[in-house]
Structures are given as C-alpha cells and as structure tokens.
Regions:
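Short, low-structural-confidence N-terminal segments
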Residues: 1-133, 274, 278-284, 294, ...
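Low-complexity segments enriched in small/polar residues
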Residues: 70, 78-79, 89-93, 100, ...
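N-terminal targeting/tethering segments
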Residues: 81-198, 202
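Envelope-exposed proteins and targeting segments
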Residues: 90-98, 103, 157-159, 212-214, ...
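Proteostasis/folding factors centered on peptidyl-prolyl cis-trans isomerases
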Residues: 189-218, 271-318
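Peptidyl-prolyl cis-trans isomerase
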Residues: 234-277, 306-313
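A short, surface-exposed interaction/processing loop segment used at functional sites
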Residues: 313-333
Length: 349
C-alpha cells in the first residue's frame, strides 16, 4: 500500500546548493536583497496609509468643529463666556452695516457685561418672565451699540480719524478720578471686573471704541461745529451774555436744539464729564469757550455762577452732535444693515 501511495506523491525536488564564486556573487547579493524588500515595503506602505488617514481624520474633525461652532453661534445663539473667548480669536461677524462687519465678539462683550451687572450688582433674577424680557432688550441694545461702533470704524477710514494710545490713557485718567482723588489702575481694573466682568484688555477695547465713535461724531458734524463757532463769536462780543436766552434764541427755527442746564451746587470733582472741572477754572460770571467733555456728545459752554473751596454752581449750554446718528439711521432705513442672528422685539411681548 505504501508503495502505491508513494507513486502518487510528488516528491519535492531538492535544489542542489550552488557555489558562490566571483562570477555569481552579484547574483546572490541581489537575491538576498530582494528577499528583504518584502519586509521593508509593507512598513513604508503602512506609514503612508497612516499619514493619509491622519489627514482625513483631521479634516473631518475640523469640519465637525466648525459646523458645531456655527450652529452654536448662529441658530442657537450661545452667549456663554466660552463662545465669547472663541469669537475674540476668530473675528466672526454677527451683522454688517453698509458693508462693514460687526464683530460677534463686540456684540457678546456688550451683552455679557450688562448681564453680569444685573446678576452680580443688581441681583436680578433673569429666569423670570420679566427677566427674560430684560435679556431680549439687552440683546437689542447690544446689537445696536455694536452696529454703531462698526459704522464709526467705517467712517473713521473715510475721515482719516484714529485713536492713539495717549488718548486712551488720558480717558483712563479721567475715569479714575473720584471725590477723594485718583484711584489706582489696579483698583479701577478690579471695579470693572466686579461690575461688568471686563478684563483690562476688554476695558481698553471698550474705551478705544467709545473714543473712536466720539471723534467720528465730531469730525462728521459740520453743522454743530458751525453753530459752536457762532456761539463763540457771540460770547467774545458779549462776555456777560445770558446763556439761557442765547440757547432759546438759537434753537428757534433751527434743526439743532441748544440745551440749557443749571447745576446748582455740586462738588468740583463731580463726575459729569469734566464740566464741573471746567467751571472751577473760571471766575464768577465768566463764560468759557467751547470745550468737549468726556461724554463726547457735543460742544459745551459753561458759566460759573458761584463757588467755594469744594463746590461750584454753574450753568451751561450744549450744542448736540446729531450728524452721526442721522447718518446711521439713514443707513438702517435704506436696508444696509444685515443681521445674522434673530433677536425678538421685547416691546411686542
């Protein structure tokens, strides 16, 4: 039986060992190297495939992150502190005004500071129906303010207006004044953080935006400047002129309404934008020339009525700035503001 089976078995032919000579050494070397390539190339292929897979995973992850971020910011309108930090890094728009992007970070900064003040300082409960209406109102006002800042940035380029670091520091110095003197920068930063949740960088940015809008408003309003020049001429011609009568006369038949205010006795350090400080420089009955207060809302003329060591009594007239608000209203009415989020009107609820 074994003999029969052996007939059908294929015997493996044993290759006789070949001798390595000087003539065959190159052939043997190539045969050995070829045998090693099967171990080398699979590793190279695996590395190449690993790189491709890593790129694909990274792209997919990036798309997912961007999609989730877009969904959180626009459809959901996530207003968390985390999303604010994201928008500070990524300059995403929340709207456009006359082609100028309105940054989402500016909108959130204004919104979050107001919410922070209500919750931490006013101890307001924003989860009630009234609180929810307050939230919607704050969203509307924050959007309006952010749009106005963005429009001011657009006009600043055309008017060649800018804010320097010295302007910002001067504003800081004015805002740090108190009845007991100037508070420190650290104290001011602590107050801003406690009241509004602003870091020092946030406060710097807010101040820069405010000053730029003021400068644009002054540069744009030629009518207010002309009115101010006319009042200056009248005061020079009649130093004892009655400011109340002057304001009434100039307002009659004019598109600009000159405001008149009497202060009564107030501290010389009264936080009124610098009006009391300006009045303290005058002699009794003297009227100042035009000056721009820290509020940045017009040209002021102040007259000192009386004073003592710590207080002043004064009256003043104000030439308001209207051109910027008029220009912004025109842009809005012409449909040149596009908002990328929907904010319900709280007045309709």
């Amino acid at each position: 039986m074994k003999k029969i089976l052996n007939k059908f078995r294929k015997k493996e032919e044993v290759q006789p060992a070949s001798r390595i000579t000087s003539e065959t050494v190159a052939h043997h070397r190539e045969r050995i190297l070829a045998g090693g390539r099967k171990f080398k190339y699979p590793i190279q292929y695996a590395r190449h495939k690993l790189v491709i897979n890593a790129i694909i995973i990274s792209v997919v992850a990036l798309v997912v992150v961007l999609t989730v971020g877009w969904w959180q910011l626009y459809p959901v309108q996530n207003t968390s502190e985390f999303m604010y930090r994201i928008t500070k890094v990524l300059p995403l728009p929340v709207a456009t005004v006359d082609g100028q992007p309105v940054l989402y970070s500016d909108y959130l900064m204004k919104y979050l500071s107001s919410i922070h003040y209500l919750e931490k300082i006013e101890q307001a409960n924003l989860k009630t129906d009234d609180g929810k209406r307050q939230i919607e109102y704050i969203k509307q006002e924050s959007m309006k303010d952010a749009i106005a800042d963005a429009y001011a940035q657009k006009l600043a380029k055309d008017l060649n207006v800018s804010v320097s670091e010295s302007d910002i520091q001067a504003s800081f110095k004015i805002q740090r004044q108190s009845s007991s003197g100037e508070v420190s920068e650290q104290t001011s930063d602590a107050v801003n953080l406690d009241y509004y949740g602003w870091s020092s960088d946030d406060y710097h940015h807010v101040t820069e935006q405010k000053l730029l809008r003021q400068k644009v408003a002054y540069a744009l309003d030629k009518t207010a400047l002309a009115t101010s020049d006319m009042i200056t001429t009248k005061i020079k011609n009649d130093p004892s002129i009655d400011l109340n009568t002057l304001a009434t006369t100039l307002s009659e038949g004019s598109s600009i309404k000159i405001g008149y205010t009497a202060s009564g006795l107030v501290l010389k350090t009264n936080r009124d934008g610098g009006i009391a400080t300006e009045a303290a420089k005058l002699t009794k009955g003297q009227v100042s020339l035009a000056f721009k207060p820290a509020t940045g809302d017009g040209y002021y003329f102040v007259k000192l009525i009386d004073s003592n060591d710590t207080q002043v009594n004064y009256e003043y007239i104000k030439v308001p700035l209207t051109a910027f608000n008029d220009a912004l209203s025109k842009v809005i009415n012409n449909g040149k503001v596009n908002k990328y989020i929907s904010i319900p009107d709280s007045t309709t609820k």
